[in-house]
Curated annotation (Swiss-Prot):
<dbReference type="InterPro" id="IPR037022">
    <property type="entry name" value="Formyl_trans_C_sf"/>
</dbReference>
<dbReference type="InterPro" id="IPR005794">
    <property type="entry name" value="Fmt"/>
</dbReference>
<keyword id="KW-0808">Transferase</keyword>
<dbReference type="Pfam" id="PF02911">
    <property type="entry name" value="Formyl_trans_C"/>
</dbReference>
<dbReference type="InterPro" id="IPR011034">
    <property type="entry name" value="Formyl_transferase-like_C_sf"/>
</dbReference>
<dbReference type="InterPro" id="IPR005793">
    <property type="entry name" value="Formyl_trans_C"/>
</dbReference>
<dbReference type="InterPro" id="IPR002376">
    <property type="entry name" value="Formyl_transf_N"/>
</dbReference>
<comment type="function">
    <text>Attaches a formyl group to the free amino group of methionyl-tRNA(fMet). The formyl group appears to play a dual role in the initiator identity of N-formylmethionyl-tRNA by promoting its recognition by IF2 and preventing the misappropriation of this tRNA by the elongation apparatus.</text>
</comment>
<protein>
    <recommendedName>
        <fullName>Methionyl-tRNA formyltransferase</fullName>
        <ecNumber>2.1.2.9</ecNumber>
    </recommendedName>
</protein>
<dbReference type="InterPro" id="IPR041711">
    <property type="entry name" value="Met-tRNA-FMT_N"/>
</dbReference>
<dbReference type="InterPro" id="IPR001555">
    <property type="entry name" value="GART_AS"/>
</dbReference>
<keyword id="KW-0648">Protein biosynthesis</keyword>
<dbReference type="InterPro" id="IPR044135">
    <property type="entry name" value="Met-tRNA-FMT_C"/>
</dbReference>
<dbReference type="Pfam" id="PF00551">
    <property type="entry name" value="Formyl_trans_N"/>
</dbReference>
<dbReference type="GO" id="GO:0004479">
    <property type="term" value="F:methionyl-tRNA formyltransferase activity"/>
</dbReference>
<dbReference type="GO" id="GO:0005829">
    <property type="term" value="C:cytosol"/>
</dbReference>
<feature type="binding site">
    <location>
        <begin position="110"/>
        <end position="113"/>
    </location>
    <ligand>
        <name>(6S)-5,6,7,8-tetrahydrofolate</name>
    </ligand>
</feature>
Length: 317
């Protein structure tokens, strides 16, 4: 029986680990990120993969930097024949890549070579894609650039956000791994090199990408809202303070209205003008210092009127 070390950190990785366990593979160790403070109270919280591993009595390593020699030694002491990674969050050093008999394979949430990097699910929606998927590939020292072993496509629904698409891809990735690992161990695969000319990237989301630019089209703004939900969440400014926008709908308009202006008050919330003949209906928002609420509740409690402008800081008023 091949000895497998699994490396992963967030919720996306958990079904992948569960698949290895339920399929009866000998998972001799799990490597994940250190516990981190979470929430307003900054409570030290273990990664989801650690929680799952401990349920099954699997030893857990939590290196701050897996590339350090002493951390590499700890992983190799587990004598892995195969390393499987999924959203681990660190690039593996050459010693780890070279040691296992069957190499290191990674479950990546995109159709490589598109969307290499740490936020492929976000970018799939931000870019308005109609489909994405999961690729399993051999790991190399470059980011998500190894030869591809298997792929599966996943449709992106018009109503998907990062949370719902994440769950679809996590399940699809686990199922793909179930079919792929036996072929890797038996050597019955024909890995395909990636086309470097077709490579695109999905780096981690930056703060400036969260702010809604009302001069963009309604479609772009709609994709931005769902492409940042449930994390880190798009925002605009209202009355000089941040207003998070969790959910929205596109509204067709007969004429193009002023970008950022409140042009209509519907039952579900305010409609805001954009950079084309579409309005953006804000159906789920979170004013500064308050809890998330429906657009309807926001209208009921806020003094918002037709003609007001969103996206202005105090100094711009």
């Amino acid at each position: 029986m091949a000895r497998i070390v699994f490396m992963g950190t967030p919720d996306f990785s958990v079904p992948v680990l569960q698949t290895l366990i339920t399929e009866g593979y000998e998972v001799v160790g799990v490597v994940t990120q250190p516990d981190r403070p979470k929430g307003r109270k900054r409570v030290l919280t273990p990664p989801p993969v650690k929680v799952e591993a401990l349920k099954h009595g699997i030893p857990v390593l939590q290196p701050e930097k897996v590339r350090l020699d002493e951390e590499i030694d700890k992983v190799l002491a587990l004598k892995p024949d195969l390393i499987v990674t999924a959203a681990f969050g660190q690039i593996l050093p050459k010693r780890l890549l070279d040691e296992p008999q069957f190499g290191c394979i990674n479950v990546h949430a995109s159709l490589l070579p598109e969307l290499r990097g740490g936020a492929p699910i976000h970018y799939a929606i931000l870019q308005g894609k109609k489909k994405t998927g999961v690729t399993i590939m051999y790991m190399v020292e470059r980011l998500d650039a190894g030869d591809m072993i298997s792929k599966v496509e996943v449709e992106i629904d018009e109503l998907d956000n990062v949370g719902t698409l994440h769950d679809k891809l996590s399940v699809a990735g686990a199922a793909l791994l179930k079919d792929t690992v036996p072929n890797v161990l038996s050597g019955s695969i024909s890995p395909i090199p990636q086309n470097e000319d077709a490579a695109t990237y999905a780096p981690n989301i930056k703060r400036e990408q969260e702010r809604l630019d009302w001069t963009k089209t309604g479609e772009e703004l709609y994709n931005q809202v769902r492409g940042l939900n449930p994390w880190p969440v798009a925002y605009t400014e209202w009355n000089g303070a941040h207003l998070k926008v969790w959910e929205a709908k596109k509204v067709p308009l007969e004429v193009q209205e002023e970008a950022g202006k409140v042009i209509e008050l519907q039952k579900e919330g305010p409609v805001i003008g954009t950079g084309n003949k579409q309005g953006l209906l804000l159906t789920g928002v979170q004013p500064a210092g308050k809890k998330k609420m429906s657009g309807e509740d926001f209208l009921r409690g806020a003094n918002i009127e037709i003609g007001q402008k969103l996206g202005l800081m105090n100094e711009e008023k």
